[in-house]
């Protein structure tokens, strides 16, 4: 299961952006017995990166509610991903199951991007601000926004760091009051168990 991973999934890529990948793999019996999770990064000859993750890592990725992880459910390019069908079909519930966690996790990423001060991270911060707002808006969740490519060339129209953080912080009270719907996490865990059994047969 190989999926495009990175700026293309959010829409702030440029023409010469590397195409990075995430490959989701099944563990061996030995890995399961030793409770070993496959999690590594490979540098490809063309300069791109492939992250290799055990399918069991999906649960932690879902629970963390980080858009950097959840982007796999919205990847713009997927290869041999039939086993991820259930997760993609339920991605709306998965993304929004714990809006409090989603808010604080991704707010932290926004802050770290703003602190770096470089233009690329400012675009990331703006993108994640929009994603946080979208998650709380009641709209169907989407990740990719091609207008972010244009924003790179319109520096005068970009929000300041303070404006980005102010917009994110407006949602704090709503985030704190949001209930957790962890039923979808239980279902996701059962789906992974089902896939593991099928794969190991």
Label for each model-derived stretch:
Residues 2-4, 21, 58, 125, ...:
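Generic structural hydrophobic/aromatic packing signal, biased to beta-strands
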Residues 80-201:
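Conserved nucleotidyltransferase catalytic core and NTase-mimicking acidic/glycine-rich helix/loop elements
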Residues 1-35:
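Active-site nucleotide-donor binding segment shared across nucleotidyl transfer reactions
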Residues 14, 46, 116-120:
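Conserved aromatic-histidine-acidic binding/catalytic patches
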Residues 26, 63, 130:
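Residue-level marker of positions within ordered structural domains that often coincide
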Residues 4, 71-72, 134-138:
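A structural signal for short, well-ordered beta-strand segments and their strand-loop junctions
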Residues 32-113:
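A basic- and aromatic-enriched beta-loop-alpha substructure that forms the phosphate/nucleotide-
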């Amino acid at each position: 299961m190989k999926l495009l991973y990175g700026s293309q999934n959010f829409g702030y890529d440029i023409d010469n952006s590397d195409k990075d990948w995430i490959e989701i793999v099944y563990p061996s019996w030995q890995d399961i017995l030793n409770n070993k999770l496959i999690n590594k990064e490979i540098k490809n000859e063309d300069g791109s990166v492939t992250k290799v993750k055990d399918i069991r890592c999906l649960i932690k990725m879902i629970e963390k509610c980080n858009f950097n992880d959840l982007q796999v459910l919205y990847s713009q390019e997927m290869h041999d991903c039939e086993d991820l069908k259930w997760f993609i079909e339920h991605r709306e519930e998965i993304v929004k199951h714990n809006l409090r966690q989603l808010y604080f996790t991704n707010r932290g990423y926004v802050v770290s991007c703003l602190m770096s001060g470089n233009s690329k991270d400012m675009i990331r911060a703006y993108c994640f601000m929009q994603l946080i707002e979208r998650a709380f808006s009641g709209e169907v969740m989407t990740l990719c926004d091609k207008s972010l490519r244009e924003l790179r060339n319109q520096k005068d129209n970009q929000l300041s760091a303070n404006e980005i953080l102010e917009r994110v912080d407006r949602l704090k009270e709503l985030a704190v009051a949001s209930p957790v719907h962890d039923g979808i996490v239980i279902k996701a865990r059962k789906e992974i168990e089902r896939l593991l059994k099928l794969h190991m047969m």
